[in-house]
């Protein structure tokens, strides 16, 4: 594999002089690394230092100053366990975000390339670095909100670093992007879904889900519809491994401590760093073989794609000369969902699936206000993080975009399905309010019900879910409309100016 050039001097951040130049004067863009829901990512070299960097090119349509202001917050972070942010440029209609380059890619990329899930030793080593990154962010009073294998990057030495803590989410919230994948809730903590207020330990729940994802190839509930998952996560018991007997007691206990439904009882990053599963983690050198294997596979695939492109171009030229007809493209379209992953227990190999289905646009870094920071400072002693009560976050999960599409369809048939959209007395009688799932998760009362009553409750779950989805949709619509009105008013003032 191509080795990055030797650094003339290590890049810490872009100088003021560099930021006043055009980005092409400061960087040599080498190749495209990938396509995200919010833009393209390129590999580039910083000319002055010779250091390899990653550049995200994000289309910007409005509120540029607000985006730049939010991105600048990332400059506060300086940790070897967090992907560094060097600066940003505005060129034409794109925002160029310059960040640290991690040559091995994300953990989910490595799993997908190798068609194998990770071993316990590999998972423990990755989790140790990830927890150190979370401990740093949480001490800085920042919540990642999008912890998953796709946002844990590895460099070629095997060091894991947290990525996209705030950038992707903040841009998503501000830009009103189009053609994005519906955000999935599989990694989200119950308190985030329930909108009851949350703090840093919401990331710990996501880390527990990520642990299962690395071990099994996908998070719990990945095989069901995301809209159903948002009701199962808060109401069901915490998820665990599909086959617990395959995993050690230490690993099982670590995941159990992450996936405690009550945030007050959930462990912090600092506490989990003392867990035996993490304390016994092996050095990062154990990751080098799987990184080398993944990078070799990636290089071979790149060569194959180049050959296929050359052959397609040759065939295209011949077809155009012969018949002037359109050349048929590959039958596999972008975004097509493949079969979900399966794993053979012996070799831990897994059939590759399209991870796009599991991609999430939910990552938004939450910055506490100055008043909250002052309160938190009073609660800190001897460098140990103390929990603080947080008010409900005024944010709209991306999976609610699904409701907007459904609402549009419903309005076009409003005259013929009004009775279905408005639950009548009969639907209310099927699941009275006292049948709602208890918030404390205590289901012991079910033992006292008759078989007939239990069957009726089970039958009522689906219509109950539909009604709760409709109520949730109406609640978010009521919150969303004033924001849209304010944005429209702001745009009109700018146009008049």
UniProtKB/Swiss-Prot annotation:
Tell me yes or no: is Magnesium among this UniProt entry's keywords: yes
* Compositional bias annotation for Polar residues: 326-343
The UniProt catalytic activity note for this protein reads: L-seryl-[protein] + ATP = O-phospho-L-seryl-[protein] + ADP + H(+); L-threonyl-[protein] + ATP = O-phospho-L-threonyl-[protein] + ADP + H(+)
Q: How is its activity regulated?
A: Inhibited by the C-terminal non-catalytic region. Activated by caspase-cleavage. Full activation also requires homodimerization and autophosphorylation of Thr-180, which are inhibited by the proto-oncogene product RAF1. Activated by RASSF1 which acts by preventing its dephosphorylation. When autophosphorylated at Thr-180, recruits STRIPAK complex and promotes PP2A-mediated dephosphorylation and inactivation of STK3.
What keyword terms does UniProt attach to this protein? Answer: Acetylation, Apoptosis, ATP-binding, Coiled coil, Cytoplasm, Kinase, Magnesium, Metal-binding, Nucleotide-binding, Nucleus, Phosphoprotein, Serine/threonine-protein kinase, Transferase, Ubl conjugation
Question: InterPro entries in the record, alphabetically?
Answer: Kinase-like_dom_sf, Mst1_2_SARAH_domain, p53_tetramer_sf, Prot_kinase_dom, Protein_kinase_ATP_BS, SARAH_dom, STE20/SPS1-PAK
Annotated SARAH domain ranges read 443-490
Q: What residues does the Protein kinase domain cover?
A: 27-278
Coiled-coil boundaries: 287-328, 366-387, 448-479
Which sequence positions carry the modification called N-acetylmethionine? 1
Of the GO CC terms on this record, one is: protein-containing complex
Q: What broad class describes the main subcellular location of this protein?
A: cytoplasm
Q: Which PANTHER family match?
A: STERILE20-LIKE KINASE, ISOFORM B (PTHR48012:SF2), STERILE20-LIKE KINASE, ISOFORM B-RELATED (PTHR48012)
Q: Which family does it belong to?
A: Belongs to the protein kinase superfamily. STE Ser/Thr protein kinase family. STE20 subfamily.
Stated name of the protein = Serine/threonine-protein kinase 3
**Which species does the entry assign this protein to?**
Mus musculus (Mouse)
